[in-house]
Amino acid sequence: MHWRIGLIGYGEVGRIFAQDLRAKGLQVCVHDTKANALNAQSAELMDHAHRHGVQWKTSHAQVCANSDLVVCAVTASQTLAAAQACAPHLLSQAFFLDLNSASPGTKKAAATDINQNGARYVEAAVMTSVPPYRTQVPMLLGGAFAAQASTALNQLGWHTRVASDQLGVASATKMSRSIMIKGMEAMVIESLCTARHHGVEDAVIASLYETFPGVDWEKQASYFFQRVIEHGRRRSEEMHEVAVTVSEAGLTPWLATATAQRQSHMADLADAGVFGNKADAGFARNPDWRIEADRLLHSVSTNQHKPST
């Protein structure tokens, strides 16, 4: 298969996919609006692309005009805007793979824009963390073109399966799961920071081991802190989409909304440097959650970064 592949978004997922696709000898190009800022972050992204042989494009249109498959991996709040920016420029019959964590309603709206311009929209739901699996991360696909896309992607070594030929099923699965996963992250951070403040964290951890003996709570807690410190903003935006999904079911999204707030607050702290310099190699990689909890507690105790209410 000699697909030309375009990436919209060059965050963690985009960079991982680019590296793996280039390793297979495929032509890859990318556009990320963050590069428009011309700052250290944009320079780092473009340097990464250059080192891996990824062609940097200056617009959505340039990516779409040169791609048989466009993989969209932006933040949740930009899902529809990214699809609309790409739609007029996609090649006829090109696949548009929407990896974004968005509600079924948002995915359906994006599909309308893509399909009416002659391309093929495929809803995708990434079902676990990407870094351990890379392009083999388990992925659910949905929509009228899901079966065609799944066959082609699996030939590239991806791990996809069709959830439904109807749009919304894959994303509903992902969004419902996120209530649990992102909610657990928020609960663990809030629970253990509270316990740490009161000096009872060891007792709480011991109780968790007794109740859920199959989980390494020390390791899991540190991993949750790491992921939220690094990706809290993205997770917060996803949880706002989850809240929309919950509302579509006729329920009040109390948990989804609270989780979004906790994730957003962690992102604010990270942006303010509470957890260290983002440019440092060790940022969000601390193996001991207690160190990050102490940083958080010190910040809020001095009224430096109290969450808004």
Predicted feature residues:
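NAD(P)-dependent dehydrogenase/reductase Rossmann-like domain
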Residues: 266-309
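Rossmann-fold dinucleotide-binding core
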Residues: 102, 107-182
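Conserved beta-strand segments of alpha/beta enzyme cores
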Residues: 27, 55, 95, 120, ...
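Helical "substrate-binding/catalytic lid" subdomain
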Residues: 173-279
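Rossmann-fold NAD(P) dinucleotide-binding segment
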Residues: 60-121
